[in-house]
Curated annotation (Swiss-Prot):
Full protein name: Acidic phospholipase A2 BA1
PROSITE patterns with a match to the protein in the record: PA2_ASP, PA2_HIS
SUPFAM superfamilies reported in the protein's UniProt record: Phospholipase A2, PLA2 (SSF48619)
Cysteine disulfide links: C26-C116, C28-C44, C43-C95, C49-C124, C50-C88, C57-C81, C75-C86
Keywords from the UniProt entry: Calcium, Disulfide bond, Hydrolase, Lipid degradation, Lipid metabolism, Metal-binding, Secreted
One annotated GO molecular function: calcium ion binding
Compartments in which it is found: Secreted
Length: 124
């Protein structure tokens, strides 16, 4: 679920997820189009694509099982669909952490769709 994803992001990056990522670049937050603007925005693009591949459950609302082991996220549970959601969220949270050095909220926060032309969109 989005709430679990927020917790993963907070723990991995130390940032407040909604403030830091919900309005970043062309793909972080709701929707997405255009070309990802930097590595963090690409994390969101890949996460959106990952969610598109999930079938049989709702990535935004269905809770899944996960735990922390040695600073890493471990997805668990018996439901393969929910585990898939968890793996999408896990990969994005790690991606955000690994790209903190190029995160640029001054440049890409509240970027707006007008700066993300539909014709520049990439396939998943």
């Amino acid at each position: 679920s989005l709430i679990q994803f927020e917790k993963m992001i907070k723990k991995m990056t130390g940032k407040e997820p909604v403030v830091s990522y919900a309005f970043y670049g062309c793909y972080c937050g709701s929707g997405g189009q255009g070309k990802p603007k930097d590595a963090t925005d690409r994390c969101c693009f890949v996460h959106d694509c990952c969610y598109e591949k999930v079938t049989g459950c709702d990535p935004k609302w269905d809770d899944y099982t996960y735990s922390w082991k040695d600073g890493d996220i471990v997805c668990g549970g018996d439901d393969p669909c929910k585990k898939e959601i968890c793996e999408c969220d896990r990969a994005a949270a790690i991606c955000f952490r690994d790209n903190l050095n190029t995160y640029n909220d001054r440049k890409y926060w509240a970027f707006g769709a007008k700066n993300c032309p539909q014709e520049e969109s990439e396939p998943c």
